[in-house]
């Protein structure tokens, strides 16, 4: 997105990756800097879930920011395992194993995040119980899964595409109505008997005090 805005609009768009707190670090950074509208937070709709769960204490994502635009709609939310995992190989065998061994399968999420909601929904639909672990950011979860210190992570299929290509990771299911056009080999949870569908949009937002002219320009660029 930054590269496209730089090319199309002639702007110098600098990306600063701020991990932690299910987006809290990034939101707080934007709020603590000058409200001239030149600093945006790029995040997704899962922030509303985190807000409702009471994980954001120093700000409110719904009241303290204004949207500049929503450039991405994502349908690739997924459950992913390490292919070398010996407990199960797909959703069917995972559920069977979990029913025989309640709480033995670890699921990595970030407390209060969108993936936290995903795992709770799956547990209810399948009648099983994970051992839910707060393993931090998407990259941290991926590292732990690669090291076989976790059984399943909630992430986006695109974020682990390299490991899917090398067969090191297995995508157990996409939380969407239909299979992904770019990954038609991955089944949906819905077709496997679990009607769990979650999509999310990514957006750019700035503090309420930001210059409206800058917000309008960003919206036009998007």
Spans of model-derived segments:
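Ligand-binding clamshell of periplasmic/extracellular solute-binding protein-like
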Residues: 21-24, 37-50, 70-74, 153-163
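Hinge/capping helix and adjacent helix->loop/strand transition within the periplasmic-binding protein
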Residues: 5, 29-38, 52-140, 201-222
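A ligand-binding cleft/hinge motif common to bilobed small-molecule-binding domains
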Residues: 46-58, 116-125, 151-185
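Signal peptide-proximal N-terminal region
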Residues: 3-14
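Short helix-initiation/N-cap motifs at beta->coil->alpha
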Residues: 18-26, 73, 111, 133-143, ...
């Amino acid at each position: 997105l930054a590269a496209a805005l730089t090319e199309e609009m002639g702007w110098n768009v600098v990306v600063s990756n701020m991990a932690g707190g299910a987006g809290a670090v990034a939101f707080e950074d934007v709020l603590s800097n000058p409200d001239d509208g030149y600093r945006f937070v790029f995040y997704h709709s899962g922030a509303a879930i985190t807000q409702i769960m009471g994980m954001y204490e120093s700000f409110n994502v719904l009241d303290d920011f204004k949207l500049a635009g929503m450039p991405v709609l994502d349908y690739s939310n997924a459950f992913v395992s390490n292919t070398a995992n010996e407990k199960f190989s797909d959703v069917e065998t995972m559920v069977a194993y979990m029913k025989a061994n309640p709480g033995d399968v670890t699921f990595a999420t970030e407390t209060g995040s969108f993936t936290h909601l995903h795992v709770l929904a799956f547990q209810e639909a399948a009648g099983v119980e994970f051992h839910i672990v707060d393993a931090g950011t998407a990259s941290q979860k991926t590292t732990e899964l690669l090291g076989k210190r976790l059984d399943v992570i909630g992430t986006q299929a695109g974020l682990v595409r390299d490991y899917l290509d090398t067969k090191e990771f297995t995508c157990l299911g996409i939380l969407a109505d239909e299979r992904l056009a770019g990954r038609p080999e991955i089944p949906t949870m819905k077709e496997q008997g679990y009607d769990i569908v979650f999509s999310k949009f990514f957006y750019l937002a700035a503090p309420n005090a930001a210059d409206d002219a800058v917000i309008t320009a960003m919206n036009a660029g998007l």
